[in-house]
């Protein structure tokens, strides 16, 4: 759920990667089909159409991604960070740890008193 | 300064080179595929003998198939480059991610602090009860010299009887020269000052 926007784009790129694999697969199937004595024309047509569609889709998607990057890229490195809040959070956790330590000391003292 | 100004241009050229690579690779895939299909056609006999022609076609197909695979791999590389570029330079999503992380961490911190404060309130009450128990029990009499808490108490008024000593820690607590435990207990006493005596009464 976190980092949804960036993740979406990355996931789209992963889909494109898979589609590139599908392109090669389709091309291979088409050529394999051609090499057969009796070719199944329907299958051939379907695979060839899938191949062309995949290639066009990949090209369009990648063009769109590059166009988006042209829009957002400024050339300056990003300078924001979550370090300060992370530090604050760590301090809070340390406080809790320390409190727990002290409490366990108190508990030990109590037990000692009970034993005596 | 000059370097900073040069950077956007290089980004621009980088993106343009990405675009060029994309176009080249796609074109290469399509062209090579078409050529392979064309080569598959059996041509009429020419001056070149059948066997030679077949060998040549075989070789050409190998090369073209390798070209297609190379173009595909190049596209993969392009996608990975784009991913990297996206992670490094996609400011809107980077900002969003940082905001979300900040919110998460702040919520966690607030929860921690809230729990700590709740713990403090509980512990101050418990400590008060513990001390009460301790001063009214016999162990405080026999081990008075061992514990600084007790010591401070006894030093302050040594002749108080056991009924009065219940409220005595409250009086003794502001003493700055008191020992470690008492110092630690002092703020809790001042905090629990309100509910303390009423409970006691």
Swiss-Prot record, chain B:
Is Cytoplasm among this UniProt entry's keywords? no
Asked if the Swiss-Prot or TrEMBL record annotates the protein with the keyword Transcription, the reply is yes
Q: What is its main location?
A: nucleus
Q: InterPro entries from the xrefs?
A: Med22
| GO MF terms, alphabetically ordered | transcription coregulator activity
Top-rank taxon of the source lineage equals Eukaryota
UniProt keyword list: Activator, Coiled coil, Nucleus, Transcription, Transcription regulation
- Extract the coiled-coil ranges from the record: 93-123
Segment Disordered: which positions?
Answer: 166-201
Entry's localization field: Nucleus
- Name the cystine pairs: none
One Pfam family from the record = Med22
What Gene Ontology terms describe where this protein resides (cellular component)?
A: mediator complex
UniProt GO BP: regulation of transcription by RNA polymerase II
User: What does the subunit comment say?
Assistant: Component of the Mediator complex, which is composed of MED1, MED4, MED6, MED7, MED8, MED9, MED10, MED11, MED12, MED13, MED13L, MED14, MED15, MED16, MED17, MED18, MED19, MED20, MED21, MED22, MED23, MED24, MED25, MED26, MED27, MED29, MED30, MED31, CCNC, CDK8 and CDC2L6/CDK11. The MED12, MED13, CCNC and CDK8 subunits form a distinct module termed the CDK8 module. Mediator containing the CDK8 module is less active than Mediator lacking this module in supporting transcriptional activation.
Role noted for this protein: Component of the Mediator complex, a coactivator involved in the regulated transcription of nearly all RNA polymerase II-dependent genes. Mediator functions as a bridge to convey information from gene-specific regulatory proteins to the basal RNA polymerase II transcription machinery. Mediator is recruited to promoters by direct interactions with regulatory proteins and serves as a scaffold for the assembly of a functional preinitiation complex with RNA polymerase II and the general transcription factors.
Name of the protein in question: Mediator of RNA polymerase II transcription subunit 22
> Which gene underlies this protein?
MED22
């Amino acid at each position: 759920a976190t980092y949804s926007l960036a993740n979406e784009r990355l996931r789209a790129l992963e889909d494109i990667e898979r589609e590139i694999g599908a392109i090669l697969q389709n091309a291979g199937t088409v050529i394999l089909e051609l090499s057969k004595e009796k070719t199944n024309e329907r299958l051939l047509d379907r695979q060839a159409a899938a191949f062309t569609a995949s290639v066009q889709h990949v090209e369009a998607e990648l063009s769109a991604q590059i166009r988006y990057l042209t829009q957002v890229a400024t050339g300056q490195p990003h300078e924001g960070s979550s370090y300060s809040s992370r530090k604050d959070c760590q301090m809070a956790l340390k406080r809790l740890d320390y409190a727990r330590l002290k409490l366990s000391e108190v508990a030990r003292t109590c037990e000692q008193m009970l034993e005596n | 300064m000059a370097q900073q100004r040069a950077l956007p241009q290089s980004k621009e050229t980088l993106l343009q080179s990405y675009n060029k690579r994309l176009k080249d690779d796609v074109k290469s895939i399509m062209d090579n595929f078409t050529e392979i299909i064309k080569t598959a056609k059996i041509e009429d006999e020419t001056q070149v003998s059948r066997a030679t022609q077949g060998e040549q076609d075989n070789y050409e197909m190998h090369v073209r198939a390798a070209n297609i695979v190379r173009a595909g791999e190049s596209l993969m590389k392009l996608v990975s480059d784009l991913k990297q570029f996206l992670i490094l330079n996609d400011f809107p999503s980077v900002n969003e991610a940082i905001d979300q992380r900040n919110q998460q961490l702040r919520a966690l911190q607030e929860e921690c602090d809230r729990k700590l404060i709740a713990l403090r309130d509980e512990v101050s009450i418990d400590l008060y009860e513990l001390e009460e128990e301790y001063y009214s029990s016999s162990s405080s009499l026999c081990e008075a010299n061992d514990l600084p808490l007790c010591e401070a108490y006894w030093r302050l008024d040594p002749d108080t009887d056991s009924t009065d000593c219940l409220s005595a820690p409250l009086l003794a607590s502001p003493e700055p020269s008191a020992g470690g435990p008492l110092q630690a207990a002092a703020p809790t006493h001042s905090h629990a000052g309100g509910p303390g005596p009423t409970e006691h009464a």
